[in-house]
Amino acid sequence: MSGIKLPGSRASSRAIVRWLVRKNIIKEELTTCGRTGNRMAYALADGARAVVLHPEALPFNEPINGLEIIYKRCIYTPAKGFLEEAGCPECLKEVGEALFESLEDWMPGHTDNFTCPLCGHEDDINGFLFLQECGFSNLGFIFNNWAEAGFKQSFIDEFADWLDQKMSWVKVEL
């Protein structure tokens, strides 16, 4: 799951972790159940069954099953079959090629916005229309191997409320 640029992203993530631990969705201590970097993540806990559509698909017996939190500017897209298609919310025209080329300016933080080359509409990059879920953010939550279980919409909504931000659930197939 990812959101938009968040000032105080570490404080936001700590609040999310405390909430997830209270609901017994993740365990409190970091372990090596992640996939990236030093592999440190919060392991899956029994309460996760209550927030997914298919609890039997949760990766309880997998070594990689934890929640990783990413604090750097990242682009979150499906790993397979991402079409790089985007539309302008103002003129409703396809601008995907130009938008994805502009990421060279977005990644290092030169800008948070994109301007439609067709109508001049400027907005935060997450304000543009994407055919597939994706997100551009300095805060990301990677639930390793949870995609098949599928999150309940009520959980996604509550997660966004805790963040106090709009967010995207990007399902990554590795």
Q: Where do the model's predicted regions map?
A:
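N-terminal alpha-helical interaction blocks
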Residues: M1-G81
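Short secondary-structure junctions
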Residues: V21-C33, E97-A98, L163-K171
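N-terminal leader/targeting segments
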Residues: K72-I75, L83-E90, F100
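Flanking scaffold residues of small Cys/His-coordinated metal-binding clusters
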Residues: K80-L83, H110-T111
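Short cysteine-rich clusters marking metal-coordination/redox-active sites
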Residues: C88-C91, C116-C119
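Short, non-ligating residues that shape and space the ligands of small metal-coordination modules
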Residues: G96-A98, I125-N126
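Short linker/helix segments within small regulatory modules
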Residues: E101-T115, L131-Q132
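Long, charge-rich boundary regions
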Residues: P117-L174
